[in-house]
From Swiss-Prot:
This is Ribonuclease HII. The gene is rnhB. Pfam families: RNase_HII. It is an enzyme of class 3 (hydrolase). A divalent metal cation binds at D20, E21, D112.
């Protein structure tokens, strides 16, 4: 398996943040982004990869290692903001908030995908960036672990939707629960399965 590395970062100079988001597709819960900066790019953390390729246990171990050696920021866009704007604009908002939370003077921002937020720093969009850039892959892990923890908290309030397992995604089990129990304030009303249930 090929792992991300610092090739993209090393082509640039200065302080470089990697940014990624988690939670664009679910029917419930916020979208969360993380921004990660490795000040010392000689730092080696074995196993960093796109969070979707890692087990929950592996993500948790890597998360702890990343936050112990890297600078990071977290940004969230709430369900209310997703409902008010749309998921794309809410995602960009969460990315911008992650960079603000990072609170560093940056030279470049590497963003996974092709729809970056408008920020004051130079931005490079990297399609499949979480497979190429260590900084972006690390951001994907930090964002994923953060959101999974939040969905666990929401699960404790609404266990009937089993968000601990499905993380708010539109699984058959989740859709059946919506049919039985209706929707909560944590559901995205402008997503088709939810809007049809209203």
């Amino acid at each position: 398996m090929k792992y991300p590395d610092f090739t993209l970062e090393n082509k640039l100079s200065g302080v470089i943040a990697g940014v990624d988001e988690v939670g664009r597709g679910p029917l419930a819960g916020p979208v969360i982004s993380a921004a990660v900066v490795f000040i010392d790019r000689n730092t080696i953390i074995d196993g960093i990869n796109d969070s979707k390729k890692l087990t929950p246990q592996c993500r948790q171990v890597l998360y702890e290692k990343i936050i112990s050696v890297a600078k990071f920021g977290i940004g969230m866009a709430s369900v209310e903001e997703i409902n008010s704007y749309n998921i794309l604009q809410a995602t960009k908002l969460s990315m911008k908030r992650a960079l603000i939370d990072l609170d560093l003077e940056l030279d470049y921002v590497l963003v996974d995908g092709n729809q970056p937020p408008e920020v004051k720093w130079q931005v490079k969009s990297i399609v499949n960036g979480d497979n190429l850039s260590t900084s972006i892959a690390a951001a994907s892990i930090v964002a994923k672990v953060t959101r999974d923890r939040l969905m666990q908290e929401l699960h404790n309030k609404h266990p009937e939707y089993n968000w601990y397992k499905n993380k708010g995604y539109g699984t058959k089990e989740h859709l059946n629960a919506i049919g039985l129990y209706g929707i909560t304030e944590h559901h995205r009303r402008n997503f088709a399965p939810i809007s049809r249930a209203l």
